UniProtKB/Swiss-Prot annotation:
Main localization category: mitochondrion
Compartment list: Mitochondrion; Mitochondrion inner membrane
PANTHER family recorded: ATP SYNTHASE SUBUNIT ALPHA, MITOCHONDRIAL (PTHR48082:SF2)
Lineage per the UniProt record: Eukaryota, Fungi, Dikarya, Ascomycota, Saccharomycotina
Name listed for the protein in its UniProt record: ATP synthase subunit alpha, mitochondrial
Family annotation (InterPro entries): ATP_synth_asu-like_sf, ATP_synth_asu_C, ATP_synth_asu_C_sf, ATP_synth_F1_a_nt-bd_dom, ATP_synth_F1_asu, ATPase_a/bsu_AS, ATPase_F1/V1/A1_a/bsu_N, ATPase_F1/V1/A1_a/bsu_N_sf
Gene: ATP1
PROSITE patterns on file: ATPASE_ALPHA_BETA
Alphabetized NCBIfam families for the sequence: atpA (TIGR00962), PRK13343.1 (NF009884)
Recorded GO MF terms: ADP binding; ATP binding; proton-transporting ATP synthase activity, rotational mechanism
Site entry (Required for activity), positions: 410
CDD domains per the UniProt record, alphabetical: ATP-synt_F1_alpha_C, ATP-synt_F1_alpha_N, F1-ATPase_alpha_CD
Keywords: ATP synthesis, ATP-binding, CF(1), Hydrogen ion transport, Ion transport, Membrane, Mitochondrion, Mitochondrion inner membrane, Nucleotide-binding, Transit peptide, Transport
Function comment: Mitochondrial membrane ATP synthase (F(1)F(0) ATP synthase or Complex V) produces ATP from ADP in the presence of a proton gradient across the membrane which is generated by electron transport complexes of the respiratory chain. F-type ATPases consist of two structural domains, F(1) - containing the extramembraneous catalytic core, and F(0) - containing the membrane proton channel, linked together by a central stalk and a peripheral stalk. During catalysis, ATP synthesis in the catalytic domain of F(1) is coupled via a rotary mechanism of the central stalk subunits to proton translocation.
Length: 548
């Protein structure tokens, strides 16, 4: 007879054998499938990187991986490079194919580089070397009248530019002590801007609105209006203009250059173009390049105006770069530092103190909204950074009110201190009249029985709105704006038919220049109206209206 222990061990071996058989029935097919999958599976990108790293290590032990590197992967304007251990953030690097790039991501084991050119020319395994330079551009008066790309290279076919100096594209903005408050005017030549939303030298004034509402037209008219001072010899009155086109069509940029040439305004302007067909890194760096060019004038005691058209496209380009470099996305998929991107750019606009040369750089950034939504991420960011905004509305544009500036939503936080005194004297109540008109007009459409004062408010508001209309490429000097606004605010247009307001403007200005030139010349030279001149202007306006 078998002992109890022998029976127990025999039963255990039987159970174990059955368990092995059942496991084999389940596990063998799974192992076979897994084996087949493993045989047919593609290597992951990280595995490819590690394989390439091992191979590079094998052949490049003697070469110095601190100063050079090799391309692991390239695509979408981004190159991932193994090596370059000593590379600095935002350093310029050069590929053996001749393409240049900027080190934007410094990661353990590899460097993320954005390419300033076509990624088709860059091949896997290609050698990359440090240049020891941060991205810099040529600066100086030699750039005036030229069109350059995002890296400062000429693209207008007029030959090379022998710039007198070079400056880094990204530098720290001036501190608090070297600055002084805004106190000198930047005259745009637009009645609705100069009278209601005045801009000063060193200010940042945002131009915001939907597509095709005339944002670029406002900026372009401002450039054209500087011709009257830039043709003179007084350097303190000149305002040099830098226009940067980000993500725009090449045809649009060509048309803009042609317009400036036709109006003899290109000679005091510099165009920086990073068009829609350019790589995202170039659209990202172009505004910084333009800021460096404008800063040369600011730091040499001169005055410059810079127009960023537009920063929403720069933000989109930066979002593309950040996502491709696998930086964590935030609101609307923009990276967390997109606010810093725009703040460090716009803070470079400043009015310097006399001790620091007294120069200035004025910024007019442009932001395109979608469906009038100013509460989106980028518009709210830039509104909070700037010193005010000019808000353009599609609804006003389609009504024929051009420039389509919404006077109620537009504001200038620091410009009133810089406004031409004569304009401030006559335009003080203009904003109030227009606000009352908008309020009354909203209710007037519901009822026909209106009292006399309401009818007068409506009549004056309609005429003031008509008076603020202006044709493109026809900016007005302050001495021309003051008499017109004076006539409108003081009710001299109330009995003139709306269809004849434009005719009144032309004939009234001609009448003043012919018969009362002392008013025009006093505003031009002194910028303000004395009591005697105000009385003369009043009698001149009354006598002209009586015969009109």
């Amino acid at each position: 007879m078998l002992s109890r222990s022998a029976i127990r061990s025999a039963s255990r071996s039987v159970v174990a054998a059955n368990l092995v058989r059942s496991m084999n029935r389940v596990a063998r097919p799974a192992l076979v499938v897994a084996g087949r999958r493993f045989a047919s599976a593609k290597a992951q990108p990280t595995e490819v990187s590690s394989i390439l790293e091992e191979r590079i290590r094998g052949v490049s032990e003697e070469s110095n991986l601190n100063e050079t590197g090799r391309v692991l992967a390239v695509g979408d304007g981004i190159a991932r490079v193994f090596g370059l251990n000593n590379v600095q953030a935002e350093e310029l690097v050069e590929f053996s194919s001749g393409v240049k790039g900027m080190a934007l991501n410094l990661e353990p084991g590899q460097v993320g580089i954005v390419l300033f050119g076509s990624d088709r020319l860059v091949k896997e395994g290609e050698v990359v070397k440090r240049t020891g330079k941060i991205v810099d551009v040529g600066v100086g008066p030699e750039l005036l009248g030229r069109v350059v790309d995002a890296l400062g290279n000429p693209i207008d076919g007029k030959g090379p530019i022998n710039a007198s100096g070079r400056s880094r594209a990204q530098v720290k903005a001036p501190g608090i002590l070297p600055r002084r408050s805004v106190h000198e005017p930047v005259q745009t030549g637009l009645k609705s801007v100069d009278a209601l939303v005045p801009i000063g030298r060193g200010q940042r004034e945002l131009i915001i609105g939907d597509r095709q509402t005339g944002k670029t037209a406002v900026a372009l008219d401002t450039i054209l209006n500087q011709k009257r001072w830039n043709n003179g010899t007084d350097e303190s009155k000149k305002l040099y203009c830098v226009y940067v086109a980000v993500g725009q069509k090449r045809s649009t940029v060509a048309q803009l250059v042609q317009t400036l040439e036709q109006h003899d305004a290109l000679k005091y302007s510099i165009i920086v173009a990073a068009t829609a067909s350019e790589a995202a890194p170039l659209q990202y760096i172009a505004p910084f390049t333009a800021a460096a060019i404008g800063e040369w004038f600011r730091d040499n005691g001169r005055h410059a105006l810079i127009i960023y058209d537009d920063l929403s496209k720069q933000a989109v380009a930066y979002r593309q770069l950040s996502l491709l470099l696998r930086r964590p996305p935030g609101r609307e998929a923009y990276p967390g530092d997109v606010f810093y991107l725009h703040s460090r750019l716009l803070e470079r606009a400043a009015k310097m103190s006399e001790k620091n040369g007294g120069g200035s750089l004025t910024a007019l950034p442009v932001i395109e909204t979608q469906g009038g939504d100013v509460s989106a991420y980028i518009p709210t960011n830039v509104i909070s950074i700037t010193d005010g905004q000019i808000f353009l509305e599609a609804e006003l544009f389609y009504k024929g009110i051009r420039p389509a500036i919404n006077v109620g939503l537009s504001v200038s936080r620091v410009g009133s201190a810089a406004q031409v005194k004569a304009l401030k004297q006559v335009a003080g109540s203009l904003k109030l009249f227009l606000a009352q008109y908008r309020e009354v007009a909203a209710f007037a459409q519901f009822g026909s029985d209106l009292d006399a004062s309401t009818k007068q408010t409506l009549a004056r508001g309609e005429r003031l709105t008509q008076l603020l209309k202006q044709n493109q490429y026809s900016p007005l000097a302050a001495e021309e704006q003051v008499p017109l606004i004076y006539a409108g605010v003081n009710g001299y247009l109330d009995n003139i038919d709306i269809s004849r307001i434009a005719e009144f403007e032309t004939k009234f200005l001609a009448y003043l220049k012919a018969n009362h030139d002392e008013i025009v010349s006093a505003i031009r030279e002194k910028g303000e109206l004395s009591k005697e001149l105000l009385a003369t202007l009043k009698s001149a306006t009354e006598s002209f209206v009586a015969t009109f």
